[in-house]
Swiss-Prot record:
Function (record text): Assembles around the rod to form the L-ring and probably protects the motor/basal body from shearing forces during rotation.
Gene from which the chain derives: flgI
Pfam families: FlgI
PANTHER family: FLAGELLAR P-RING PERIPLASMIC PROTEIN FLGI, FLAGELLAR P-RING PROTEIN
Protein's name according to its UniProt entry: Flagellar P-ring protein
Single GO BP term: bacterial-type flagellum-dependent cell motility
The family this protein is said to belong to: Belongs to the FlgI family.
Organism expressing this protein natively: Pseudomonas entomophila (strain L48)
InterPro entries named in the record: Flag_FlgI
Annotated signal sequence range: 1-22
C-alpha cells in the first residue's frame, strides 16, 4: 500500500539515482494505455485563387458543395451540374488527439487535397467534424491554412513548383469536443512498455524501481514490458509516476545492425558492429560504348544517296582493386577506414557488406530497406 511518506522518501532518494550514461525512464518506455488517437475528416477548403478542383474531373467536390448549401436552405437550380468552382477544393483532414485531451482544448491539424487542386495556399477550411475509428466525433476543425509550398504556371505551359502546395497545416485548428476514455486510474498496477524491447533493460528497470520503492513493486512481464504496483488514489498515482518517469536507467546495448537503403545508397553501420577475420577484394568491370557515326557521300553523277553509317566502339576495362584484410574484432571505425582507402562507392560497400554477411564474417543483422 502506497502512502505519502513513501512517495516523499522516494523523491529524496532521486538524487542518488542518476547514472553517468543513463536515460530517463520516460525516454525509453511508455505507459500502457496512455497514447494518442488518430482522427480523420472530410471537408472543403474555400477562398482559393483559382487553384481549386476542376469539378468536371472531381464530381464529389461539387456534390459536397451542394450538400453544404442545402444545409443552409439554398437550392442549386437543376442543370447546373457543370458549374466550375475554381476556388473550392475537397480535402481530407487528420489530427492526433493527445492523451488526456479535454473538451475545449485545441490540437493541430493537417489538411491535404484529395482532388486535383493545384494549391491550397490562401484557403480556409470550413467546419469539419473529425471522427475516430469508432465513428464518434471527437473534434471540430476550421481555420485558415498555412501552406509551405507554392505553384506558378505561365501561359505557355511552363510552371514552377516549390515544396508541396497541395497540403498545409492549421496550428490549433481543431477544438476537442469529446474526451477519449482512459484506463489510467483503473486497477492497482500499471504496465510500462519499452520503446525497444530488451531483456537487459527490463531487468535494470525492475532493479531500479525495487531499489527505490521496495522489493516486489516492479515485476518484468517479458522483454518489452514491466508491471509496477501503483496507488489507487489519482493524485498519488500522478506523484508516483512523476518519480518513476524521471528515474535514470542504463539501457542494454542495442543489437548490432547494418541498415542499407538500396534506393538512395544510404548505409548506416551501428556502433557494435564487428567483423570476424576475412580478406576482401572488390573489382569492377567498366564497359564503355561510344557511337561515332560517319556520313557516306556518293560520288558526283553516281545516282547514289547520302547515308549515315553507324559506327560503334566498345571498350571494356577491368579495374584492379587491392585486397584488404579484417582482423578479429574489427570495429566500425576500422571498417570505414579500410573501405575508404580503396575508394569504394556506396554501391560497392553494399556488395562488400552483403558478401561478408554471407561468409559469416559480419557479426550484425543486415537489414535492407
Amino acid at each position: 500500500m502506497f502512502n505519502a511518506r513513501r512517495l516523499i522518501a522516494a523523491t529524496l532518494l532521486m538524487s542518488c539515482a542518476f547514472g553517468a550514461h543513463a536515460e530517463r525512464l520516460k525516454d525509453i518506455a511508455s505507459i500502457s494505455g496512455v497514447r494518442a488517437n488518430q482522427l480523420i475528416g472530410y471537408g472543403l477548403v474555400v477562398g482559393l485563387n483559382g487553384t481549386g478542383d476542376q469539378t468536371t474531373q472531381t464530381p464529389f467536390t461539387l456534390q459536397t458543395f451542394n450538400n453544404m448549401l442545402s444545409q443552409f436552405g439554398i437550392k442549386v437550380p437543376p442543370g447546373s451540374g457543370n458549374v466550375q468552382l475554381k476556388n473550392v477544393a475537397a480535402v481530407s483532414v487528420h489530427a492526433d488527439l493527445p492523451p488526456f485531451a479535454k473538451p475545449g482544448q485545441v490540437v493541430d491539424i493537417t489538411v491535404s487535397s484529395i482532388g486535383n487542386s493545384k494549391s491550397l495556399r490562401g484557403g480556409s477550411l470550413l467546419m469539419t467534424p473529425l471522427k475516430g475509428i469508432d465513428g464518434n466525433v471527437y473534434a471540430i476543425a476550421q481555420g485558415n491554412l498555412v501552406v509551405g509550398g507554392f505553384d506558378a504556371e505561365g501561359r505557355d505551359g511552363s510552371k514552377i513548383t516549390v515544396n508541396v502546395p497541395s497540403a498545409g497545416r492549421i496550428p490549433g485548428g481543431a477544438s476537442v469536443e469529446r474526451a477519449v476514455p482512459s484506463g489510467f486510474n483503473q486497477g492497482n498496477s500499471l504496465t510500462l512498455n519499452l520503446n525497444r524491447p530488451d531483456f537487459t533493460t527490463a531487468k535494470r528497470i525492475v532493479d531500479k524501481v525495487n531499489e527505490l520503492l521496495g522489493p516486489g513493486v516492479a515485476q518484468a512481464v517479458d522483454g518489452g514490458s514491466v508491471r509496477v504496483t501503483a496507488p489507487m488514489d489519482p493524485s498519488q498515482r500522478v506523484d508516483y509516476l512523476s518519480i518513476l518517469e524521471n528515474l535514470e536507467i542504463d539501457p542494454g546495448q542495442a543489437v548490432a545492425k547494418v541498415i542499407i537503403n538500396s534506393r538512395t545508397g544510404t548505409i548506416v553501420i551501428g556502433q557494435n558492429v564487428k567483423v570476424s577475420p576475412a580478406a576482401v577484394t572488390h573489382g569492377s568491370l567498366t564497359v564503355t560504348i561510344t557511337e561515332d557515326p560517319i556520313v557516306s557521300q556518293p560520288g558526283p553523277f553516281s545516282n547514289g544517296q547520302t547515308a549515315v553509317v553507324p559506327r560503334s566502339r566498345v571498350n571494356a576495362q577491368q579495374e584492379a582493386k587491392p585486397m584488404f584484410k579484417f582482423g578479429p574484432g574489427t570495429t566500425l571505425d576500422e571498417i570505414v577506414r579500410a573501405v575508404n582507402q580503396v575508394g569504394a562507392a556506396p554501391s560497392d560497400l553494399m556488395a562488400i557488406l552483403e558478401a561478408l554477411k554471407q561468409a559469416g564474417a559480419l557479426q550484425a543483422d543486415l537489414i535492407v530497406i
